[in-house]
C-alpha cells in the first residue's frame, strides 16, 4: 500500500538520511563544535510519529553558527526500555506500553535529550490493533535557535549565495551529467544555496543519484536545495522516472485521493534520488483556452477544483519529504502569451483575482505550502507602476516577479505567506528582454523574492546584489529575512551536511527500487484510466475487435505511441504518420478502412484552427470515408473545436504511454470512461461546444 503512515520505518528513514551532503573530516572539526542537539528539538521541526517508529537525528552546532549532521561517534540511549528502545542510528521503536522515556544522545563531550509520553488505549474491535498515542516533549532553550545563530555567523557573500539557484544545464556546450571541477568551484566560490536540474542532467537513475550526491558534497556549510520541474504530464524531467499524467488529467478524475497518490509517488522518486525540492504543482486557473504555456499543466478552469486537487497533490509531495512549490503567483492561467517568449498581462481587478486566480494559492498557503514561485506576468490593477524597457525604450508595466506590491504587500502582508518565494527563471524573455541581469535580480529581491532562479550571469548577479546591499539599495534586514526563510525550509526538510559520507551504493540501490517502480506504474495507469474523458460518441464506441477487420490509425510523430496501444487489440492495424493532408496512397488506406482512429496534437491556438495542416488532414479523412472516425485529443481537449462533426472524441490530456493505453482501452471497451471535462470547450461561433463537467460513459 502506498501510505505515508506506513513509510516511517527504520529502513526508509535510514535511507532518507543518506540524501544529504557530508562535510569532509578536518583536523579542527572537533574544535569548532559548540553543541550537540537532537534535530527534533528544533522549534521549526514538526515531529510526526505514525506507526511505532521514529528516526531521531543529531546535529553538531559549530562556533561559527552553522550546523552539520552528526552520524558517527555518537551514542543513543533510552531511559525506559519498556516504553521504547533506540538503536545505534537513532531509530526509536515504541512498544505500546504506557509510560515515559527520555532518549539521550551524546558524543562523549556534549549531550541532548528528548522525551516521549506513550498512552495506549484498548483496541476498538476484537481483531484490531491497540491505539497508541505518542506525545513528543521537546527540550527548550536558546541552544535550539540554530537558524538565527547561523545567520549571525554568515558573511554578506554567503547570505547572497543562499539566495541564488542557477542551472548547470550545459557546460562548454555539453549536458552536465557528472560533477565537473569547474562547477564545484562555482558552488563554493559563490556559496550557492541551491541548483536546478533539467532533463539533460537526469538521464539514468544511477547517474542522477551520483550527480545529486556530488552536488551536495560540493556544498559548503549547508546542504543545497536541489530542485527540478517534475510536474507530471507534459513537464517531466526524470528520464528514468514514472511519467505520471499531468494536472488536467487529474482534474478530469475529480479525485483528491489520486492527486495525493500522484504527488506522493513523484515525491518518493525525487527523494530517492536526493532531489529535495519540486517546482510543482501549477496552481494557475486555466480559464483561457488560448493559453499557450499553461493549458494541461493546470488542474482546470474552476478555482475550487484547482485548489482542492492542488492541496492534495501538495500534501502528497510534502508527505514524501520533498518541498513543494506552488506556481505561478498570482496566476498565469488567463494569458494568451507565453512568458518564455513575451510579457503577458492579466487585466483583472482585485475582486476577480481574489475569487479566481488567488484562491488556489491562498488555500495552498493555508495548507502549509513550502514555497511559491512568481509569475513573469503584469497585473496592472494590482501594480500600475511603469518602467522603461531596455528593449525599445517604451514604458511597460512591472512584472509580478519584480513587484513589491505583488510579492510583499499582496502575498506576504495580505495573504499571510511566510514561506520561501522563488522567482520563475530569470532568463525568460518576459524579464531578460526588458531588464538587465543585475537590475532584474535586485528588483526581485527588493520586491520580496527569497531565491533568484537561474540568474543570467552568476558572477555578475552575485556581485550586483552585494553592491546593492553596500550602497543601501537592499537592506541587510531584507537579506537576513530571506536567508532565514531559506534555512528554515532546509531545517524543516532535514537538509544538512553530513559529517561522514554515506554509502553511495546504498543510495543507488534504494533509488533503483523506487524510481519507476511497479507500484508507481500502477498509480500512473490508474490516474490515466480515470482521466480519459469521452466527450462525444455517436453510438460508435466501444469498438468490437471482432467487427474491425481493417483499422487505420493516423497521427503525427506521436502515432508510434498510439500504434503501440492499438496493436494490443488489433495487431494488423494500418498506421499512417502524418500531420498534413494525406497523399493518394495514404488516402486509399483510409477509403478501405472500416474504422479510423486519429490522434491530433496541438500546442496552441494556431494548431487547432480548421485551416491548419493537421486539421485539414482530419477534414480530408472525413471526406474520404463513410467509416466511423474516432479522434483523440492527445494534449489539449480543445482540438474537437476544429472537427465537431467527428463520430467520437476522447480527451487524454497528455502524451504519456499510459494515457495512450488508457484512451485505446476506452475505445475498445476495456476501460469504462469516467472522466469529466475540467474546462469548457468553446465553439468557433462564440458559443459553447461542451460544458465544464461534461463527460459520457458506457
Question: Where are the model-predicted features located?
Answer:
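Sec-dependent N-terminal signal peptides of Gram-positive bacterial secreted proteins and lipoproteins
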Residues: 2-29
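Active-site-adjacent structural elements in enzyme catalytic domains
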Residues: 202-219, 223, 254-272, 484
Amino acid at each position: 500500500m502506498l501510505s505515508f503512515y506506513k513509510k516511517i520505518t527504520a529502513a526508509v528513514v535510514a535511507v532518507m538520511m543518506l540524501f544529504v551532503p557530508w562535510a569532509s573530516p578536518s583536523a579542527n572539526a572537533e574544535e569548532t563544535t559548540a553543541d550537540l542537539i537532537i534535530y527534533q528539538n528544533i522549534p521549526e521541526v514538526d515531529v510526526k510519529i505514525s506507526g511505532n517508529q521514529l528516526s531521531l537525528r543529531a546535529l553538531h552546532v559549530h562556533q561559527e553558527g552553522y550546523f552539520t549532521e552528526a552520524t558517527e561517534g555518537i551514542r543513543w540511549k533510552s531511559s525506559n526500555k519498556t516504553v521504547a528502545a533506540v538503536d545505534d542510528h537513532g531509530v526509536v521503536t515504541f512498544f505500546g506500553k504506557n509510560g515515559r522515556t527520555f532518549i539521550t544522545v551524546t558524543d562523549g563531550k556534549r549531550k541532548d535529550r528528548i522525551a516521549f509520553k506513550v498512552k495506549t488505549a484498548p483496541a476498538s474491535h476484537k481483531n484490531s490493533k491497540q491505539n497508541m498515542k505518542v506525545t513528543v516533549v521537546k527540550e527548550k532553550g536558546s541552544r535550539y535557535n540554530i537558524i538565527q545563530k547561523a545567520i549571525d555567523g554568515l558573511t554578506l557573500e554567503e547570505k547572497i549565495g543562499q539566495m541564488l539557484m542557477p542551472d548547470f544545464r550545459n557546460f562548454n556546450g555539453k549536458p552536465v551529467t557528472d560533477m565537473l571541477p569547474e562547477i564545484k568551484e562555482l558552488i563554493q566560490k559563490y556559496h550557492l544555496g541551491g541548483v536546478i536540474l533539467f532533463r539533460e542532467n537526469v538521464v539514468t537513475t544511477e547517474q542522477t543519484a551520483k550527480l545529486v550526491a556530488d552536488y551536495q558534497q560540493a556544498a559548503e556549510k549547508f546542504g543545497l536545495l536541489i530542485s527540478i520541474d517534475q510536474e507530471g504530464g507534459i513537464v517531466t524531467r526524470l528520464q528514468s522516472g514514472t511519467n505520471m499524467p499531468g494536472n488536467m488529467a487529474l482534474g478530469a478524475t475529480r479525485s483528491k485521493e489520486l492527486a495525493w497518490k500522484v504527488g506522493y509517488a513523484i515525491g518518493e522518486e525525487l527523494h530517492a534520488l536526493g532531489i529535495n525540492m519540486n517546482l510543482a504543482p501549477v496552481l494557475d486557473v486555466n480559464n483561457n483556452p488560448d493559453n499557450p504555456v499553461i493549458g494541461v499543466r493546470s488542474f482546470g478552469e474552476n478555482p475550487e477544483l484547482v485548489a482542492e486537487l492542488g492541496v492534495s497533490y501538495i500534501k502528497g509531495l510534502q508527505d514524501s519529504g520533498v518541498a513543494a512549490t506552488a506556481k505561478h503567483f498570482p496566476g498565469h492561467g488567463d494569458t494568451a502569451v507565453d512568458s518564455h517568449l513575451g510579457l503577458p498581462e492579466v487585466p483583472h481587478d482585485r475582486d476577480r483575482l481574489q475569487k479566481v486566480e488567488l484562491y488556489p494559492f491562498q488555500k495552498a498557503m493555508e495548507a502549509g505550502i513550502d514555497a511559491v514561485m512568481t509569475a513573469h506576468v503584469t497585473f496592472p490593477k494590482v501594480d500600475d507602476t511603469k518602467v522603461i524597457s531596455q528593449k525599445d525604450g517604451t514604458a511597460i508595466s512591472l512584472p509580478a516577479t519584480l513587484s513589491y506590491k505583488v510579492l510583499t504587500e499582496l502575498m506576504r502582508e495580505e495573504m499571510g505567506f511566510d514561506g520561501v518565494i522563488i522567482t520563475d527563471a530569470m532568463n525568460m524573455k518576459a524579464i531578460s528582454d526588458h531588464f538587465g541581469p543585475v537590475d532584474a535580480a535586485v528588483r526581485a529581491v527588493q520586491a520580496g523574492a527569497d531565491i533568484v532562479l537561474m540568474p543570467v550571469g552568476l558572477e555578475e548577479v552575485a556581485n550586483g546584489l552585494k553592491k546593492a546591499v553596500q550602497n543601501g539599495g537592499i537592506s541587510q534586514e531584507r537579506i537576513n529575512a530571506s536567508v532565514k526563510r531559506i534555512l528554515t525550509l532546509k531545517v524543516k526538510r532535514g537538509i544538512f551536511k553530513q559529517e561522514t559520507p554515506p554509502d553511495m551504493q546504498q543510495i543507488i540501490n534504494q533509488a533503483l527500487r523506487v524510481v519507476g517502480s511497479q507500484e508507481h506504474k500502477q498509480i500512473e495507469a490508474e490516474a490515466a484510466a480515470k482521466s480519459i474523458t469521452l466527450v462525444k460518441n455517436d453510438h460508435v464506441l466501444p469498438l468490437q475487435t471482432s467487427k474491425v477487420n481493417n483499422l487505420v490509425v493516423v497521427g503525427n510523430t506521436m502515432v508510434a505511441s498510439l500504434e503501440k496501444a492499438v496493436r494490443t487489440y488489433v495487431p494488423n492495424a494500418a498506421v499512417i504518420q502524418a500531420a498534413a493532408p494525406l497523399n493518394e496512397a495514404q488516402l486509399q488506406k483510409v477509403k478501405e478502412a472500416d474504422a479510423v482512429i486519429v490522434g491530433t496534437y496541438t500546442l496552441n491556438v494556431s494548431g487547432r484552427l480548421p485551416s491548419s495542416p493537421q486539421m485539414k488532414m482530419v477534414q480530408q479523412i472525413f471526406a474520404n470515408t463513410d467509416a466511423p472516425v474516432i479522434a483523440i485529443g492527445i494534449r489539449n481537449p480543445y482540438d474537437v473545436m476544429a472537427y465537431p462533426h467527428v463520430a467520437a472524441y476522447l480527451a487524454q490530456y497528455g502524451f504519456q504511454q499510459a494515457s495512450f493505453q488508457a484512451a485505446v482501452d476506452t475505445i475498445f471497451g476495456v476501460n469504462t470512461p469516467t472522466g469529466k471535462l475540467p474546462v469548457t470547450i468553446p465553439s468557433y461561433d462564440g458559443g459553447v461546444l461542451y460544458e465544464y463537467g461534461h463527460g459520457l460513459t458506457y
